[in-house]
Amino acid sequence: MSNPDTIIIDTGCANLSSVRYAFERIGADVEVSDDIDKIKAATRVVLPGVGTARAAMKALKDKKLIDTICSLTQPVLGVCLGMQMLTKASQERGGLSYGNSSKDCQCLGLIDTNIEQLDAKGLPLPHMGWNQISPSEHPLFAGVAEGSYVYFVHSYRAPLGDFTIAKCEYGEGFSAAIAKDNFMGVQFHPEKSAAVGATILRNFMKMNAGSFAGNHKSTQESAQ
């Protein structure tokens, strides 16, 4: 029996089933697994996550998945906390101990930015509910209109930068999605974002390792 095209990494987080169902609703062949060989063989990989960065990184370390994820050349999509784990470090220090709990949590280091607390300018935290995004021309957002609504639940964010492929505003501007080469992440929950979320997942399902061959430019450079 052949492996599914898409592996959702079993990080032990609470939203695994909802992410899997979202892919199944669009007809994708997916499996939730922490098997290293299956992850390496997949056409594309999804890294979901809810909770704290420190607890999530400890889970990846305990499953011996960190080196595997960092070595992947196929499309990888981080969702919510999964997006944050693609960065260098996070200020979100709570949860289980992973390294020195008095310091920022070291993440996967695949996208050159850090996660900091969202400056909501007095608005309630977490930022929870529907909000509009401003997407770039990155293929993950093909067919997604300016001002489309997606569903967020978060208190930490990636700042705006060269890696930003979609923007949002909640007290301050922040990255609703980031990317570098084959690694992409969305701060919002596409599995809870109705038709817009389904479009984004379909776009991801069109990608393969060849989509990124020879592409080492920043997202903004590629869009110009």
UniProtKB/Swiss-Prot annotation:
Catalysis performed (reactions): 5-[(5-phospho-1-deoxy-D-ribulos-1-ylimino)methylamino]-1-(5-phospho-beta-D-ribosyl)imidazole-4-carboxamide + L-glutamine = D-erythro-1-(imidazol-4-yl)glycerol 3-phosphate + 5-amino-1-(5-phospho-beta-D-ribosyl)imidazole-4-carboxamide + L-glutamate + H(+); L-glutamine + H2O = L-glutamate + NH4(+)
**Top-level taxon of origin:** Bacteria
Alphabetical list of NCBIfam families matching this protein: IMP_synth_hisH (TIGR01855)
Catalytic-site annotation from UniProt: C80, H189, E191
Intracellular or extracellular location(s)? Cytoplasm
Q: In which pathway does it act?
A: Amino-acid biosynthesis; L-histidine biosynthesis; L-histidine from 5-phospho-alpha-D-ribose 1-diphosphate: step 5/9
Predominant location of this chain?
cytoplasm
Task: Give a GO cellular-component term.
Answer: cytoplasm
Biological process terms from the Gene Ontology for this record are: L-histidine biosynthetic process
E.C. designation(s): 4.3.2.10, 3.5.1.2
> Which residues pair up as cystines?
none
Lineage of the source organism?
A: Bacteria, Pseudomonadati, Pseudomonadota, Gammaproteobacteria, Alteromonadales
Q: From which residue to which does any coiled coil extend?
A: none
Q: Which residues form the Glutamine amidotransferase type-1 domain?
A: 5-214
Name any one GO molecular function.
glutaminase activity
What's the stated role of this polypeptide?
IGPS catalyzes the conversion of PRFAR and glutamine to IGP, AICAR and glutamate. The HisH subunit catalyzes the hydrolysis of glutamine to glutamate and ammonia as part of the synthesis of IGP and AICAR. The resulting ammonia molecule is channeled to the active site of HisF.
Annotated keywords: Amino-acid biosynthesis, Cytoplasm, Glutamine amidotransferase, Histidine biosynthesis, Hydrolase, Lyase
Per its UniProt record, what Pfam families does this chain match?
GATase
Please list which residues make up the signal peptide. none
Oligomeric state and partners?
Heterodimer of HisH and HisF.
Q: What is this protein called?
A: Imidazole glycerol phosphate synthase subunit HisH
Q: Quote the gene name from the UniProt entry.
A: hisH
Q: InterPro entries this protein is in? A: Class_I_gatase-like, GATASE, Imidazole-glycPsynth_HisH
